[in-house]
UniProtKB/Swiss-Prot annotation:
The lineage of its organism: Bacteria, Pseudomonadati, Pseudomonadota, Gammaproteobacteria, Lysobacterales. Pathway: Aminoacyl-tRNA biosynthesis; selenocysteinyl-tRNA(Sec) biosynthesis; L-seryl-tRNA(Sec) from L-serine and tRNA(Sec): step 1/1. GO terms for cellular component: cytoplasm. This is Serine--tRNA ligase. Pfam families: Seryl_tRNA_N (PF02403), tRNA-synt_2b (PF00587).
Length: 426
């Protein structure tokens, strides 16, 4: 959520900026009307509260002198209903304003390129050279079918479209990838491993920005009156660990990593990537989350992105680093780097990691703060999140980049200790 003072004091400028850089239309007239009404009700409420306080003081003084207070009590009773109604009206209009504020996306940093969509993203760097094959290559679906490793038919019987059953060596490779990533981030990158719930409440989704705007993207479950949501990323669970907390300065930065199942409805995918495992309803991800002081978030963003890059480099997978333009960034992000891995079957790079600095946007929604050791006062933290990386897509990239002419897959050296020394599967 943006700083409310921007909505109150710089509304026209904010609306122009949001339209230009985010393509988001803010109803200025409606907001001005709401804010004007809020001020009117607040002034009226404060006047009645002041009157109540003065009358209460007068009643106390009169009682101490043994005087009759019935007339004063009658005066208080006369406006108490009005005060109660005014307080309720004030709370209602504040809730209305907050609903509007919760739908407004974050503002980009000044160095984020202006653009409408992914076509205007800016490539920052490349690593590795795509392999040249001397045989007809297969995509991951064909490779999986050769050995019965990827079973979409059974998954469809169990759950429907966009699910896959992994069998045998490929299931083992998938597990090895996740374990290897966790070990790297914990042992070498200094992240704390956290095992988090994958079912969360609505407050958690409001905190990180998935609700109320993106409810259609979420799977949910209802038990009696209690509605819960399946996480689309463990960023939700990890980041909300600091919701309504004040963190001492010497504990920052907090760096957490989790490997979890993730669930997405893919409501806005428009029928893209229906073949294979590129876009699934259920998938696994190793997620990185950092919570830090505001002045440290830019450096932390570069560090986190570098940690994700290291995963691809240790696997020997060619990739490129992309700075997203204003029109392609996520709702809560103020700056985002995507990492795209090379898929030989498609002859192109595909997203495998997205690392975002959210500034104080999520922290304000969560009331996540740190205690400034100089002033002693609580201030909003900055939050960051990034895939370190998507496990299924890493598996696809390994299958395709390490395939052999006979359909077997060479196991990357870094994964062999996790697979009892196997150098090849299939």
């Amino acid at each position: 959520m943006l700083d409310p003072t921007l909505l109150r004091q710089q509304l026209a400028k904010l609306a122009e900026c949001l339209l230009t850089v985010r393509g988001f239309t803010l109803d200025v007239a409606a907001l001005e009307a709401l804010e004007s009404e809020r001020k009117r009700i607040q002034v009226h409420t404060q006047e009645l509260q002041s009157l109540r306080n003065s009358k209460s003081k007068a009643i106390g003084q009169a009682r101490s002198k043994g005087e009759d207070v019935s007339a004063l009590m009658a005066e208080v009773a006369a406006f108490s209903d009005d005060l109660k109604a005014s307080e309720i009206a004030l709370e209602e209009i504040r809730t209305e304003l907050e609903k509007v504020a919760l739908d407004i996306p974050n503002l980009p940093q000044q160095d984020v390129p202006l653009g409408a969509d992914e076509r205007e993203n800016v490539e920052q760097a490349r690593w590795g050279v795509p392999r040249t094959f001397d045989f007809a290559i297969k995509d991951h679906v064909e490779l999986g079918a050769c050995h019965g490793w990827l079973d979409a038919e059974s998954a469809a019987k169990l759950s429907g479209a966009r699910f896959t059953v992994l069998r045998g060596p490929i299931a083992r490779l998938h597990r090895a990838l996740a374990q290897c990533m966790l070990d790297l981030h914990v042992s070498q990158h200094g992240y704390e491993e956290v095992n988090v719930p994958i079912i969360v409440n609505a407050d958690s989704l409001h905190g990180t920005g998935q609700l109320p705007k993106f409810e259609e993207d979420m799977f949910s479950t209802q038990l009696g009156e209690h509605r819960r949501y399946l996480i689309s990323t463990s960023e939700i669970s990890l980041t909300n660990l600091v919701r309504n907390e004040i963190i001492e300065a010497d504990r920052l930065p907090l760096r957490m990593v989790a490997h979890s199942l993730c669930f997405r409805s893919e409501a806005g995918s428009g029928g893209r990537d229906t073949r294979g495992m590129i876009r699934q309803h259920q998938f696994e991800k190793v997620e990185l989350v950092s919570v830090c002081k505001p002045q440290e978030s830019e450096g932390e963003h570069h560090r986190m992105t570098r940690c994700a890059e290291t995963v691809l480099e240790m696997l020997g997978l060619p990739y490129r680093k992309i700075l997203l333009c204003t029109g392609d960034m996520g709702f809560a992000a103020t700056k985002t780097y995507d990492l795209e891995v090379w898929l030989p079957s498609q002859g192109m790079y595909r997203e495998i990691s997205s690392c975002s600095n959210c500034g104080d946007f999520q922290a304000r929604r969560m009331q996540a703060r740190w205690r400034n050791s100089v002033t002693g006062k609580p201030e909003l933290v900055h939050t960051l999140n990034g895939s370190g990386v998507a496990v299924g897509r890493a598996m696809i990239a390994v299958m395709e980049n390490y395939q052999n002419a006979d359909g077997s897959i060479t196991v990357p050296e870094v994964l062999r200790p996790y697979m009892d020394g196997l150098s090849r599967i299939g």
